[in-house]
């Protein structure tokens, strides 16, 4: 009996085949809409005095920063073809170098986090200076963390629809049509294929093996699990503004770091730190570290620094208010 699952033949990157609207693009549109509505809902629920027009300017800068940061990280860090260095306009355009429409093919969330902070910071110190958006910026980062995590899984579902970001070989896994096939002469490949019910003829040089659906696992933990922790646990123990955003960054980085062990390293990068070269299908080392894990460790440290800094800001405000009350 076959011990694997075939990738659904009816699932395609396009929502409707022949029409250049992809699940990936649709997922981002939905995540933006969910975040926009959910952040505004929290503002109203907590009676935070922010004008709608100021909020919309803030959200525009946040979305723009997240997209720019995500695209820059994806194209300049993960892509090693050099095409974006020689054709930098392709970073921001949904076309290839021959001007064929492709849509945006890649966003790196680590860069998205950075852009989602830098762009609004610039905006609140220019366009929105001396507004309540500037006053409540840290509170808005908390709201944004909760809102974004609630819709995050949609992006990973789109990755699954694209049959990308799949995991390592596993019995009972899914055979992704776009997965990198294995040379049948690699030690352990023929034995593994036989154990899951895949036949290899004497003339087969390559074979596609079942893999872990790591994009779905990432989506579950970095999306719903993180959202529930933020909404039902950390929101209740929050002591100061900015705390939830720092926790969110650390939670995301924590889950991402460990789930990366299940994920196939990026083909062009491989392992950034290779403690033990992989020469057979069964070999594995926790000390082989991918780019995603390095960036996740950096993100985790950034989240911790954010928590420490925002705690000092909160303590300073309390001290100033206490001194002011004492003088009065």
Curated annotation (Swiss-Prot):
Pathway: Protein modification; lipoprotein biosynthesis (diacylglyceryl transfer). It is found in: Cell inner membrane. One of its GO terms (molecular function) is phosphatidylglycerol-prolipoprotein diacylglyceryl transferase activity. A 1,2-diacyl-sn-glycero-3-phospho-(1'-sn-glycerol) binds at residue 156. GO terms for cellular component: plasma membrane. InterPro entries: Lgt. It comes from the Bacteria. Its EC number is 2.5.1.145. The keyword Transcription does not apply. The keyword NAD does not apply. The chain crosses the membrane at residues 15-35, 57-77, 106-126, 242-262, 289-309. Keywords: Cell inner membrane, Cell membrane, Membrane, Transferase, Transmembrane, Transmembrane helix. It holds the Pfam family LGT. It is a multi-pass membrane protein. GO terms for biological process: lipoprotein biosynthetic process. NCBIfam families: lgt. Catalyzes the transfer of the diacylglyceryl group from phosphatidylglycerol to the sulfhydryl group of the N-terminal cysteine of a prolipoprotein, the first step in the formation of mature lipoproteins. Belongs to the Lgt family. This is Phosphatidylglycerol--prolipoprotein diacylglyceryl transferase. It comes from Borreliella burgdorferi (strain ZS7). The gene is lgt.
């Amino acid at each position: 009996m076959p011990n694997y699952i075939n990738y659904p033949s009816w699932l395609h990157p396009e929502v409707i085949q022949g029409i250049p609207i992809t699940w990936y693009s649709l997922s981002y549109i939905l995540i933006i809409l969910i975040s926009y509505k959910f952040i505004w809902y929290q503002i109203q629920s907590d009676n935070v005095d922010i004008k709608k027009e100021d909020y919309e300017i803030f959200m525009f800068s946040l979305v723009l920063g997240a997209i720019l940061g995500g695209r820059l990280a994806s194209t300049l860090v993960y892509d090693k073809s050099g095409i974006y260095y020689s054709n930098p306009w392709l970073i921001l355009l949904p076309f290839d170098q021959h001007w064929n429409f492709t849509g945006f093919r890649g966003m790196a969330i680590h860069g998205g986090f950075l852009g989602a902070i830098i762009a609004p910071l610039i905006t609140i110190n220019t366009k929105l200076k001396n507004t309540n958006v500037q006053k409540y910026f840290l509170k808005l980062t908390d709201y944004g963390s909760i809102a974004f995590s609630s819709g995050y899984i949609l992006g990973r579902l789109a990755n699954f629809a694209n049959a990308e970001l799949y995991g390592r070989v596993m019995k009972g896994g899914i055979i992704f049509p776009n997965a990198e096939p294995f040379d049948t002469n690699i030690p352990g490949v023929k034995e593994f294929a036989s154990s899951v019910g895949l036949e290899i003829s004497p003339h087969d040089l390559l074979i596609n093996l079942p893999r872990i659906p790591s994009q779905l696992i990432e989506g579950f933990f970095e999306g719903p699990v993180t959202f529930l922790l933020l909404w039902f646990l950390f929101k209740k123990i929050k002591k100061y503004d900015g705390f939830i955003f720092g926790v969110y960054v650390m939670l995301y980085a924590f889950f991402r770091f460990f789930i990366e062990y299940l994920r196939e390293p990026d083909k062009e990068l491989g392992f950034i730190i290779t403690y033990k070269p992989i020469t057979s299908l069964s070999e594995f080392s926790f000390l082989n570290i991918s780019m995603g894990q390095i960036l996740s460790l950096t993100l985790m440290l950034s989240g911790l620094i954010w928590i420490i800094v925002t705690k000092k800001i909160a303590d300073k405000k309390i001290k100033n208010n206490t001194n002011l009350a004492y003088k009065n």
